[in-house]
Amino acid sequence: MTMFKKAVKSFQWGTYQVTMETGEIARQAGGAVIVNVDDTVVMGTVVASKSAKPGQSFFPLTVDYLEKTYAAGKIPGGFFRREGRPSEGETLISRLIDRPLRPLFPEGFLNEVQVVVHVLSINPDVPSDIPALIAASAALAVSSIPFAGPVGAARVGYANGQYLLNPTRTEQATSELDLIVAGTQAAVLMVESEANQLSEEVMLGAVVYGHDQMQTAINAINDLVCEAGKPEWDWTAAPKDEPFIAKVTALAEAPLREAYQIRQKGARSDKLKEISKEVMAKLSEEGDVDAVAVSDIMFEIEAKIVRSQILNGEPRIDGRDTRTVRPIEIRNGVLPRTHGSALFTRGETQALVVATLGTARDEQIIDVLEGEYRDRFMFHYNMPPFATGETGRVGSPKRREIGHGRLAKRALIPVLPSAEDFAYSIRVVSEITESNGSSSMASVCGGCLAMMDAGVPVKAHVAGVAMGLILDGNRFAVLTDILGDEDHLGDMDFKVAGTANGITALQMDIKVQGITKEIMQVALAQAKEGRLHILSKMQEAMGSVRTELSAHAPRMVSFKIHPDKIREVIGKGGATIQALTKETGCSIDIKDDGTVTIASTSAEGMAEAKARIEGITAEAEVGKIYEGPVVKLLEFGALVNILPGKDGLLHISEISNERVKEVKDYLAEGQVVRVKLLAADERGRLRLSLKAAMADEGGTIAPLAGAAEVATEAAPATGESA
């Protein structure tokens, strides 16, 4: 007899065996489901408040995806040996889970909801993001919380003309597509992808394929709900105060219609604030007014005005039709001492983007559950509050900034040169200086131009455009290059980036409960039209990559040494390479295969570092004459340094043709002499001759005069020298 009422559902999904279970762990949560996909195990939990907070004006949904290092059999680093703040990867997956879940909560539901997903075990070949999304969806489905799910999800790859369902990491390495699609049984809600310049037809096919394949997971969740689901809350939205809505509408609708004829964002925003104050003042004359309720009603009026105008074929907020891209201006090389820069302005959205080149040691080291890896391309997106004419917090990036940076990075990765063709690490930073919609796509355009300005040999220009949607029953309008207000008042944010040859990144977020294949088809076709227009403007501004790097960018040279010589270059405790770095001002990296990369802004320093490393790793050549200092006197001869780290024995009999009684009579420590290498044995011991060198080059050596006076008579060198 067990105390648990456990329900388990298993199903085959592509190559994976998937198990979902509930009822044993985290029983006090509103809903908890553990999903096991070939030993990648995640636990999704959800808890909701029974009532909304007084004055609550938005839906407070939070999603936290947390990776535990014990899942990979590791102990965390750091002094405290425990997990710290969420990593960038955890933040991105938290957003990935949030986006398809949020539209499925009922309108007017303002209770606080918290979804927490823990990774409990990880199979390095099975990514945890899809299991995490399935677990969160299943936890909501079995709970009592009002939710129009369940949501399914699938990862789609594309190789050899075939779609791949939930490819492993090994399969993903050869795939031309990494696409995640999430949705309900009826429609698609969210798409996130990176592609190798694939056509619109292939991308749409991948979305449809993924939606079809996710039905297996949705059906399994429904089966789990039938067996273990809790009764749904008896929740209904608060009744609308129709008389009050009518009163606000009578006061606000006409002036709001006038305000939305103002084409400039700042002036329009000021007018909207003025109208809001006037409406509040008139309502306050009749008694106390709920400011939140008035704001919500005015938002609905604004949405109705803007949406109806667009659906009726009238001009958009800024006067454009549905297909026109805002005016574009581009400047390259705007910052004098950066490696590459571009100022990309599209309407009232502007990005100042800077590219910086670095060496291998500047690569980002990323430690994830699956192991450690290095990333040579970094893209960081920042949007300070002044970009929208507001005040606010300035500091570490928020979730939105991390997500936008990742999207821009995805768009540019497919056109980057390989490390073999371009050994630099690359960091691109997009500073949004103005924002009125589509700032992430402006970052893509500016990022491509900044890299070209820096001399990065990208394969093609990349542009991005954000599409919007107004949907009312069977009527819809797709909008090219949406404004911030159109994003706010519309039903879709559909971002497409790519080259003239195809799509490199696609991201879609839906605010309604899904869209059809027809709408996606129209959006993709219209996005291509907009993208090609933007690409033409970028090509006018900068037709090709700069052939020379900035004078302030590091130059690099790579060459090979024998792997056995690496220890000699590094030296004891790193002493040799540290001295080289300090004395030449160069950055020096050595790979295990013996590849040495030297980087410096100084050509002289780089040449010196290379010469010294070649000297350290050079092999002594029998019969060659070398010049070097006497490092030690012995009774039977002297040690002479002929190459860095290589000393040879100059026997007393090889100093002079005359009989030498005392070595110190002819040589002193520090004295520079020219010697010939007579022999080298298998143990690396070197036998030198001073008299043989003199015989080849001419000259004599006389006894030293006095204790410290060196009397060396040497003819000009005629033989080889190091």
Swiss-Prot record:
Binding positions (Mg(2+)): D487, D493
Q: HAMAP family of this UniProt entry? A: PNPase (MF_01595)
Q: Where in the cell is it found?
A: Cytoplasm
BP-aspect Gene Ontology terms: mRNA catabolic process; RNA processing
Q: Which reactions fall under this protein's catalytic activity? A: RNA(n+1) + phosphate = RNA(n) + a ribonucleoside 5'-diphosphate
Q: What organism is recorded for this protein?
A: Polynucleobacter necessarius subsp. necessarius (strain STIR1)
Q: Which UniProt keywords apply?
A: Cytoplasm, Magnesium, Metal-binding, Nucleotidyltransferase, RNA-binding, Transferase
| S-S bridge residues | none
Function of the molecule: Involved in mRNA degradation. Catalyzes the phosphorolysis of single-stranded polyribonucleotides processively in the 3'- to 5'-direction.
Its cofactor is:
Mg(2+)
Q: What sort of enzyme, by top EC class, is this?
A: transferase
Entry-linked InterPro entries: ExoRNase_PH_dom1, ExoRNase_PH_dom2, ExoRNase_PH_dom2_sf, KH_dom, KH_dom_type_1, KH_dom_type_1_sf, NA-bd_OB-fold, PNPase
- Do you know which SMART domains this protein is assigned to? KH, S1
User: In what residue span(s) does the KH domain sit?
Assistant: 554-613
Q: Which GO terms describe its molecular function?
A: 3'-5'-RNA exonuclease activity; magnesium ion binding; polyribonucleotide nucleotidyltransferase activity; RNA binding
The record's gene field reads pnp
EC numbers for this chain: 2.7.7.8
What does UniProt give as GO cellular component? cytosol
- Give the protein name, as stated in the record: Polyribonucleotide nucleotidyltransferase
Annotated TM spans: none
Please report which protein family the annotation says this sequence is part of: Belongs to the polyribonucleotide nucleotidyltransferase family.
UniProt cross-references to PANTHER family, sorted A to Z: POLYRIBONUCLEOTIDE NUCLEOTIDYLTRANSFERASE, POLYRIBONUCLEOTIDE NUCLEOTIDYLTRANSFERASE 1, MITOCHONDRIAL
